[in-house]
A protein has these predicted regions:
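Mg2+/Mn2+-dependent nuclease catalytic core
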Residues: 64-99, 103
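Short acidic/glycine-enriched loop/turn segments that link adjacent beta-strands
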Residues: 39-42
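Acidic-basic catalytic patches of nuclease active cores, encompassing PD-(D/E)XK
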Residues: 1-35
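Conserved catalytic cores of phosphodiester-cleaving nucleases, focusing on short active-site segments
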Residues: 25, 44-70, 74, 93
Length: 137
């Protein structure tokens, strides 16, 4: 598989994971304010509001061939999508968050959350693990 094909598949998996996360948040009562907010120094996957708090959501998605492989990976504690949110990524996110807050003149409380999505595209199956406030106070 060529590098461009791999990147295209990775982008498709990521977009599918973000769509799943948006639907999950809506079902939980969040209002989606923005998606794929992009600056040259970074991107925020989802910006959502729940009551008086803005949630900046980083979505991490991993794809499996079958539900059996997904369940085996989960039960054995192998690679988890949320582990891919490094300190460097959080620093970049903070800079983009500052831009979003300035542009939208928001003085609401805010936090960074992670939505870890595992998908089996062929079987149209997905799971989501939502980790609120990954930085903490």
């Amino acid at each position: 598989m060529k590098q461009s094909q791999k990147q295209g598949k990775k982008n498709q998996v990521g977009a599918y994971g973000e769509e799943i996360a948006v639907n999950y948040l809506k079902k939980q009562g969040f209002v989606i304010l923005d998606t794929n907010y992009l600056k040259k120094w970074g991107e925020i996957d989802i910006v959502a509001r729940e009551t008086s708090t803005i949630h900046f959501v980083e979505v991490k998605t991993v794809s499996y061939e079958t539900q059996h492989l997904l369940k085996a990976a989960v039960s054995h504690g192998t690679w988890r999508p949320e582990e891919n949110v490094s300190n460097h990524k959080l620093i970049k996110l903070n800079r983009v968050i500052e831009s979003w807050l300035l542009e939208h003149q928001s003085d609401l409380d805010w936090q960074i959350d992670v939505a870890a999505v595992r998908i089996v595209p062929r079987e149209k199956y997905a799971t989501i693990k939502y980790l609120p406030n990954v930085i903490g106070d």
